[in-house]
Every structure is written in structure tokens, then in C-alpha cells.
């Protein structure tokens, strides 16, 4: 009986003290859903920046993907100002 108790306590401590890393952050998951890769600081030459993963990490996706995946755009009421015509 003591052996069972000892194993149970050992199992409990190993579960509580094990290093646990949480899942992906919401921005990282969104980047992966768009077939992107989180990169530090800059994207490669053949990639476009489609968002941000974390501080200093950018979501990059190759612009030449054979099966294009539309990147969701934020809808707003912003309109560009009218340009003046030169006389």
C-alpha cells in the first residue's frame, strides 16, 4: 500500500513541477491559419508581411503561393482624401 501511495505522490509532483508551455497565442494561430510563418524582425525577399505574431515577430507568407488564400482585410469607413488637380 505504501508503494502505491509513494507512486501516487511521485506522479503528482511530476505533473505539478513539469515545465508546461501554453498553446499558441491568438495571433500566432491566426498566422498559421493563413499559411504564414512567424519570423523575427523581417520577412524573406519572396514573402509579404500579412500581420504580426508577437512583439518584434512578423507573420510572413510567400506571395507566389500556387493556391492563393485571401488575406482578410479590416473593413472601415476610411476614404482617401481627394487629390488636388494641378492647373
From Swiss-Prot:
SMART domains: DEFSN
UniProt keyword annotation of Transmembrane helix present: no
Cystine pairings recorded for this chain: 31-59, 38-53, 43-60
Assigned keywords, A-Z: Antibiotic, Antimicrobial, Defensin, Disulfide bond, Secreted, Signal
Signal peptide start-end: 1-22
InterPro entries assigned to the protein according to its UniProt record, in alphabetical order: Beta/alpha-defensin_C
Gene Ontology biological process terms, A to Z: cell chemotaxis; defense response to bacterium
Predominant location: secreted
Annotated localization: Secreted
GO cellular component: extracellular space; Golgi lumen
Any one Gene Ontology molecular-function term assigned to this protein's record: CCR6 chemokine receptor binding
Family stated for the protein in its record: Belongs to the beta-defensin family.
Role summary: Has antibacterial activity.
The protein's name in its UniProt record: Beta-defensin 109
Taxonomy of the source species: Eukaryota, Metazoa, Chordata, Craniata, Vertebrata
Amino acid at each position: 500500500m505504501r508503494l502505491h501511495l509513494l507512486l501516487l505522490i511521485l506522479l503528482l509532483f511530476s505533473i505539478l513541477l513539469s515545465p508546461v508551455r501554453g498553446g499558441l497565442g491568438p495571433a500566432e494561430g491566426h498566422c498559421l491559419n493563413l499559411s504564414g510563418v512567424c519570423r523575427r524582425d523581417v520577412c524573406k525577399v519572396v514573402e509579404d508581411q500579412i500581420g504580426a505574431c508577437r512583439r518584434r515577430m512578423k507573420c510572413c507568407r510567400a506571395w507566389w503561393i500556387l493556391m492563393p488564400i485571401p488575406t482578410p482585410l479590416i473593413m472601415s469607413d476610411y476614404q482617401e482624401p481627394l487629390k488636388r488637380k494641378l492647373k
